[in-house]
Amino acid sequence: MDLNAPLPWTLGPIVFVALGSLVRKRPFRWSLRVRNIALILLGYAMGRPFTLETGRAILSQFPLMLTATLITVSAGGFTAWLMFRHTKINFTSCLLGCVPGGLSQMVILADEIRDADLTAVTIMQTLRMLSVVFVIPFLTIHILPPASHAGTAEAVHQAGSPAEVLTFAAVAVLGAITAKKIHLPTAPMLGPILSTAAFVVITDSAAPAVPVPYINAAQILVGAYIGSSIDLTRLHQYHGMGKVLLGGVLLVLCVSMILGIAIANLTGIDLATAFLSTAPGGLTEMGITALVVGADSSTMVAYQLTRLLFIMLVFPYIARGIVYLYRKKSAGQTFKD
């Protein structure tokens, strides 16, 4: 029976691997190297439509990207305040658990900040990720108007020669290696995106499309890895978290939709691309969705990368500052009492 689920090649493996780990009471192990190979392929597919005109359009939209980032992160901060008020989890953990950054990035940051509950942060980010990964593809595929860009359906008609395929494969792999060397976030995907886009612009050549079965296989490999990283046995440890976090996720999604509509009206890009650009998902999940629905991957990557870099480079200092001020205020109130 066909369930007509959004992103079946990604979400199916996530669900079955996570549930399988729950049934067998221990997590599955999935090769990081296999996941990285899949991400290189997906990153190449996202970078190949890039052109010089696309780059100029993205640069002109940078103020909008930064504004969208600040609004989305602020909405996540408001969700953290609600979580703190309605649960027994400390404010530091709520802040790190509710901000729409990547699961791994927020967990690493939580491990570096005193008083952060690593388990609580992991569970909150996992629940947020699961909500976003299921809801956003559904909205984009079944609710929003179709995107105007060519999607993966064209892939079979744009196969390149063996020499072209080998050349661009080498470009994508070298991009991933270089990105890892200089410690870029999500290097196996971001590296090929940037290297492929740069090569296309510099050489003024058309990159061969990736056949649909290859993209589907890559989605399965990435989905299986995400599913193996989810530990559903820990969800019962924090009673009352789910409802507040779900409400917070819906709030951030509404904010993202409003931002997407505004950006679509201001820039003329299609609504699917604008929504995926502002949605609080990870670069991997939103990138796969963009490929499936035929959205403008280059614009989506630019917006998502702006937020990702802000969260990784700037937000840690903001989070530490907020936590410091909160502790100072709490200490002052305790002293008065």
Task: Give names to the regions the model predicted.
Residues 95, 105, 117-120, 145-162, ...:
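Intrinsically disordered, low-complexity non-transmembrane regions of multi-pass membrane transporters
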Residues 30-42, 62-67, 88-99, 122-125, ...:
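Cytoplasmic-side transmembrane-helix entry/capping segments in multi-pass membrane proteins
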Residues 86-127, 269-303:
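Alpha-helical membrane segments and immediately flanking helix-loop junctions
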Residues 129-169:
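Long hydrophobic alpha-helical segments that form multi-pass transmembrane helix bundles
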Residues 71-72, 100-106, 122-144, 255, ...:
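Membrane-embedded alpha-helical segments of transport systems
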Residues 26-28, 47-61, 77-92, 261-266:
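Transmembrane alpha-helix boundary signature
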Residues 1-34, 41-54, 75, 159, ...:
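Structural signature of multi-pass alpha-helical membrane transport proteins
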